[in-house]
Amino acid sequence: MAKFSKGIQNFLAQVGANDDMRISMVPKSDSCGGPGDILFFRYKLGTGRGSRAFRIFLLTEPVTKDAKTGNQLLTGFKVPEDGTYTPESLESLYNNSELPEDGYRTYIMSNIFGPLRKISKNPPEVVE
């Protein structure tokens, strides 16, 4: 597994990403996910220590293009790393609007440093 920040590792451990969940790299395009998906990535924001920190993100709208700048944008809510989460709570974050409005963010796709990753729930096994 790739090396993630301590905050990301703790988040993944809380939501059971090794058991019921899986982490996959997704393209930096409108097929990166749908509303309610949890993504995480490193984002270039200035220079110096901490300028490329990991962000955990609840997607509300896949990539859109800004008419003025031509930038591809990713919109949604920043998920606080220090919260307490379970696989079930991740599913309800989007539906129940549990994130504070001041956490709403728009990220420029070209400033995402490295791969864009999505946390996906594994489909249940079919028992015959």
Predicted features by range, described:
Residues A2-P35:
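Mixed-charge, Lys/Arg-rich low-complexity intrinsically disordered regions
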Residues P35-I38, A53-I56, N71-Q72:
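Short, surface-exposed beta-edge/turn micro-motifs
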Residues G50-K65:
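Short beta-strand-centered aromatic/proline hotspots
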Residues I56, L74-G76, D82:
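Hydrophobic beta-strand positions in blades of beta-propellers and related beta-sheet-rich domains
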Residues K65-K78:
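Short, solvent-exposed secondary-structure boundary/capping segments
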Residues K78-E128:
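Intrinsically disordered, low-complexity, charged/polar segments
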